[in-house]
C-alpha cells in the first residue's frame, strides 16, 4: 500500500497528513501559527521563517507518529493558502516578512506604462482609455505588492532573487529548487490564467511592477516537480529522494478532494475564507469579478470560485469579541467552543428572528468600499442569534455567488459537497442544505484540500491512471443532509426578498461613510 505525505499550509494552522492510496487519512496533526501582524493599517504580514519551522516540525512529527513504514511513503504533496508573497534571496531565505493574502495595502500615484510602444500594445489588446478592462488593470497596479515594494522598500526588492508563494517557499526548503504550480498562482501575479503560464506580454509585468526572471518556473499539479534533498530530508523528517508534487492552491485542491469533478457538483469550503467552487473544462470569466477563474487541481481545467474573504474567520472574531465565556465553558467540559455555539444556534429558528447579516468584513473584490452589515435587531436578540446570523449570512452570500457562476458557465448545480472546519457541524450542514435547497454532502474527511493534493500525487505517480479512477478510489460521501421543506421556504424568501436587496440599498452609504471618515481611502 502506497502512502502520501501531504503538507497543508493554512492561514491559522499548518497541518500534515498521511493518506493512503484509498484516500484514508492514516494520521494527521495540526500546529497553530502566529497570526499575521500589522505594522500599519491594511497590512497583514507573517514571519515566513517561523512558518517554515512549524511546517518542518509538524511534518516530521506526522511521519514519526504515523506508523507507516518509510518504504511505503510514495511522495510529498504540498497545498497551501494562496496569494501570499514570500520574497527570498538566492538561498531561499526571506529578505523581509511575507505579505499575506489578507493584506490590503495599495500604492497610489502610479501611472500605466506610457510611450508610443505601450500605447500601441494597449490598442492591440483592445484596451481604450475608458475600457473597463483597462480600469481593472489600473486597480491591479494599485494593489500589486511588487509595486509597493518598489516604491517603499526598494532595497528589499533589489535583494529579492525570487518572489515565491507559501507553497513554492516550502518546496524550495524540501528540494533546494525554485518552482511553483500554475494552479497555485492566483490574485495579484502576472499570470495568463487561460494559458496557465506566466503572461506572454511584457507590458503586464510593467503594470505589476516585477521582472519575469524574479518569478519561478511553473509546473502542472500532476508533474513531479522535484525530489527531497539531503537537507530537506533532515529538516522535514522525510526520505531523501522522495518525489515532491506542488499541488494546486488550497481551495482548488478542496474541489478535487470533494470529488467534485463534474460541472453539476459544487464544493463549499468553510475555512478562514468561505468559498464556493465549480469545475469547468473551459475558461469562463465574469466581467466585474463577481467570481474568479483559477487553474484547477486537474490540469487544463479551471475552478470557478465565489469568494467570501473573511468567511469562518468571522467565527473566530465572534468568539474573541462576544463569546469569551464559551471558551471558558468549553475548557471545563473538555470540548471545542464551536460545538457549544452550534448547540446554542439550534435554539434559534431559521431566519434568526429577522436578524440578517451581509458578510463583507473583507470588502468585495469589485467594490473596495463595501462593508459588513447586520440589520434587523430588536430587544429579543442575543449572542446566539448573532452567531446564527453569521452562519446564515455566509451561506446566503455563497448562494448568491453560486447563482452567478451557474448563469455564466451554463451549468446547473444539483449537489453540494462541503469541507473545512464548518463541515464538522451537523447544524451548519443542515443550514447550508436549507439555504441552497440542495442535497449537501459531508465527505469521509473534512481535510479536503489535503486529500485533493494526495489525489494529484496518486495521478502523478500513476498509482491511479486518471482522475475519475482516483476519485472513485479515494473519495467517499459519508453523510447527505436533505433540505427541510419549511426551512427552505423561509430561507428562499429571506434570500430573494431581503438578502439580495441589502447590498444595492447600502452601497451608496458605503461611499458616504468612506467620504466622511476617510476609511477606507477612496481611489
Give, region by region, the residue ranges found by the protein language model.
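Active-site-adjacent loop/helix segments that line or gate small-molecule/cofactor pockets in enzymes
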Residues: 48-51, 251, 271, 502, ...
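A ubiquitous short alpha-helical element
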Residues: 43-46, 442
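Phosphate/oxyanion-binding active-site loops and adjacent basic polyanion-contact surfaces
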Residues: 48-55, 391
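Glycine/Thr-rich phosphate-binding loops that ligate phosphate moieties of nucleotide
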Residues: 1-30, 37, 74-112, 155, ...
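Short acidic, glycine/proline-rich loop/turn micro-motifs
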Residues: 37-43
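Glycine-rich phosphate-binding/catalytic subdomain of phosphoryl-transfer
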Residues: 42, 57-332, 518-522
Amino acid at each position: 500500500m502506497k502512502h502520501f505525505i501531504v503538507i497543508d499550509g493554512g492561514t491559522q494552522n499548518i497541518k500534515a497528513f498521511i493518506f493512503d492510496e484509498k484516500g484514508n487519512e492514516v494520521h494527521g496533526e495540526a500546529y497553530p501559527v502566529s497570526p499575521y501582524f500589522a505594522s500599519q493599517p491594511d497590512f497583514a504580514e507573517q514571519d515566513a521563517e517561523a512558518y517554515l519551522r512549524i511546517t518542518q516540525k509538524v511534518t516530521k512529527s506526522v511521519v514519526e507518529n504515523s506508523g507507516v513504514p518509510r518504504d511505503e511513503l510514495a511522495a510529498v504533496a504540498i497545498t497551501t493558502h494562496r496569494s501570499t508573497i514570500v520574497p527570498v534571496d538566492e538561498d531561499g531565505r526571506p529578505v523581509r516578512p511575507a505579505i499575506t493574502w489578507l493584506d490590503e495595502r495599495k500604492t497610489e500615484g502610479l501611472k500605466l506604462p506610457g510611450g508610443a510602444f505601450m500605447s500601441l500594445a494597449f490598442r492591440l489588446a483592445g484596451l481604450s482609455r475608458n475600457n473597463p478592462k483597462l480600469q481593472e488593470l489600473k486597480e491591479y497596479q494599485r494593489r500589486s505588492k511588487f509595486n509597493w515594494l518598489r516604491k517603499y522598500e526598494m532595497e528589499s526588492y533589489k535583494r529579492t532573487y525570487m518572489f515565491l508563494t507559501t507553497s513554492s517557499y516550502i518546496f524550495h526548503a524540501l528540494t533546494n529548487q525554485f518552482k511553483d504550480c500554475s494552479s497555485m498562482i492566483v490574485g495579484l501575479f502576472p499570470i495568463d490564467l487561460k494559458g496557465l503560464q506566466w503572461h506572454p506580454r511584457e507590458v503586464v509585468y510593467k503594470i505589476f511592477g516585477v521582472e519575469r526572471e524574479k518569478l519561478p518556473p511553473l509546473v502542472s499539479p500532476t508533474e513531479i516537480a522535484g525530489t527531497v534533498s539531503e537537507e530537506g530530508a533532515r529538516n522535514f523528517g522525510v526520505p531523501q529522494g522522495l518525489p515532491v508534487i506542488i499541488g494546486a492552491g488550497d481551495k482548488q485542491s478542496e474541489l478535487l478532494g470533494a470529488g467534485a469533478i463534474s460541472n453539476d457538483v459544487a464544493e463549499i469550503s468553510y475555512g478562514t475564507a468561505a468559498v464556493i467552487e465549480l469545475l469547468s473544462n473551459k475558461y469562463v470569466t465574469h466581467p466585474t469579478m463577481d467570481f474568479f477563474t483559477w487553474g484547477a487541481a486537474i490540469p487544463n481545467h479551471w475552478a470557478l470560485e465565489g469568494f467570501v474573504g473573511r468567511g469562518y474567520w468571522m467565527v473566530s472574531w465572534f468568539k474573541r469579541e462576544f463569546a469569551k465565556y464559551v471558551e471558558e465553558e468549553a475548557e471545563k467540559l473538555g470540548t471545542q467552543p464551536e460545538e457549544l455555539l452550534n448547540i446554542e444556534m439550534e435554539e434559534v429558528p431559521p431566519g434568526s428572528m429577522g436578524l440578517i447579516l451581509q458578510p463583507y468584513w473583507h470588502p468585495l473584490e469589485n467594490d473596495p468600499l463595501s462593508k459588513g452589515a447586520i440589520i434587523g435587531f430588536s430587544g429579543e436578540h442575543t449572542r446566539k442569534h448573532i452567531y446564527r446570523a453569521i452562519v446564515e449570512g455566509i451561506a446566503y452570500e455563497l448562494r448568491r455567488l453560486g447563482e452567478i457562476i451557474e448563469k455564466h458557465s451554463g451549468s446547473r448545480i444539483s449537489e453540494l459537497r462541503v469541507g473545512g472546519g464548518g463541515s464538522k457541524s451537523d447544524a451548519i450542514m443542515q443550514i447550508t442544505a436549507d439555504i441552497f435547497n440542495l442535497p449537501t454532502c459531508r465527505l469521509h474527511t473534512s481535510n479536503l484540500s489535503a486529500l485533493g493534493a494526495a489525489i494529484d500525487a496518486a495521478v502523478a505517480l500513476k498509482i491511479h491512471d486518471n482522475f475519475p479512477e482516483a476519485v472513485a478510489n479515494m473519495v467517499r460521501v459519508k453523510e447527505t443532509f436533505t433540505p427541510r421543506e419549511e426551512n427552505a421556504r423561509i430561507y428562499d424568501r429571506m434570500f430573494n426578498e431581503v438578502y439580495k436587496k441589502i447590498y444595492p440599498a447600502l452601497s451608496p452609504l458605503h461611499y458616504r461613510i468612506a467620504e466622511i471618515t476617510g476609511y477606507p481611502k477612496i481611489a
